[in-house]
């Protein structure tokens, strides 16, 4: 399987054989498992205050009064789980292990599988990306890594007929629910992933929904956000050679 190399003007600059890693069968189950493990393992531990619902002088009157043995204060039940302002019966605990295990071979295969999915135009389209070309992934010359201005990247994406995906991701939506008040107000789709050789692209990192990564560090979550394989991806020629070793 071959891919066309494009220069910074969007013109054809040769062809390159895609590495064998792009022939890996797409394992959506492993990709989802790897993404869930990555998300779970970076979560912060959380739990209730040890004394929540117990800071009260309420006491039970005991037997002989013809009423339930429930601790009361000012005539209202306290402390017990079934009472308003009582403690939680089984609250979340910080000592609980919420991490997920993933075998090294599973992690490696998930990355290779996610890379292969970027070369499947049907999967990329099904994921919701907007582009007007038949060939994916997009491969550009190494001169791309020298770009410093975002507008230069925008011009290249327009020439390659993939800039519509940036416009799609620029349409943010306000989330429903309590998360919108906790620093997670907007929902923004993931757009193009830029994979370079030496350093992550500074010119492309501020585009709406875009992510940047190096070929040696790109992971399953970069290639398949949310566990959905088939992200629209731009590789430099050198980065394409490096991912062959993943």
UniProtKB/Swiss-Prot annotation:
Q: Which Gene3D superfamilies match?
A: 3.40.1370.10
**Protein name, UniProt field:** Large ribosomal subunit protein uL4
Biological process terms in GO annotation: translation
Q: NCBIfam families of this UniProt entry?
A: rpl4p_arch (TIGR03672)
According to its UniProt entry, the function of this protein is described as: One of the primary rRNA binding proteins, this protein initially binds near the 5'-end of the 23S rRNA. It is important during the early stages of 50S assembly.
Regions of compositional bias (Basic and acidic residues) in chain numbering = 92-103
Q: Give the family, as the similarity comment puts it.
A: Belongs to the universal ribosomal protein uL4 family.
Q: Care to name a GO molecular-function term for this sequence?
A: rRNA binding
Q: How does it assemble?
A: Part of the 50S ribosomal subunit. Interacts weakly with proteins L18e, L24 and L37e. Has been cross-linked to L18e.
Q: Name one GO cellular component term.
A: ribonucleoprotein complex
Alphabetical keyword list: Ribonucleoprotein, Ribosomal protein, RNA-binding, rRNA-binding
Q: Where is this region: Disordered?
A: 37-103
Q: Which organism is it from?
A: Haloarcula marismortui (strain ATCC 43049 / DSM 3752 / JCM 8966 / VKM B-1809)
Pfam families referenced in this protein's UniProt entry, alphabetically:
Ribosomal_L4
Keyword set includes RNA-binding:
yes
Q: Does the keyword Isomerase apply?
A: no
């Amino acid at each position: 399987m071959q891919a066309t190399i494009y220069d910074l003007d969007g013109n054809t600059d040769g062809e390159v054989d895609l590495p064998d890693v792009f022939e890996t069968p797409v394992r959506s189950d492993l990709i989802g498992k790897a993404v869930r493990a990555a998300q779970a393992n970076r979560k912060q531990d959380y739990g209730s205050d040890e004394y929540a619902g117990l800071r009260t002088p309420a006491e039970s009157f005991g037997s002989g009064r013809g009423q339930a043995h429930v601790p009361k204060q000012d005539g209202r039940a306290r402390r017990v789980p079934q009472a308003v302002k009582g403690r939680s019966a089984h609250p979340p605990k910080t000592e609980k292990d919420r991490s997920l295990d993933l075998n090294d071979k599973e992690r490696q295969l998930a990355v290779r599988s996610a890379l292969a999915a970027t070369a499947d135009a049907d999967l990329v389209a099904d994921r919701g990306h907007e582009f007007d070309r038949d060939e994916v992934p997009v491969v550009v010359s190494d001169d791309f890594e020298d770009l410093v201005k975002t507008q230069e990247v925008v011009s290249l994406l327009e020439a390659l007929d993939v800039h519509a995906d940036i416009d799609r991701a620029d349409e943010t939506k306000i989330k429903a629910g309590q998360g919108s008040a906790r620093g997670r107000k907007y929902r923004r789709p993931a757009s193009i992933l830029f994979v370079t050789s030496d350093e992550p692209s500074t010119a492309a990192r501020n585009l709406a929904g875009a992510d940047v990564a190096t070929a040696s560090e790109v992971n399953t979550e970069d290639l398949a956000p949310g566990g959905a394989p088939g992200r629209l991806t731009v590789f430099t020629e050198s980065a394409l050679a490096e991912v062959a070793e993943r």
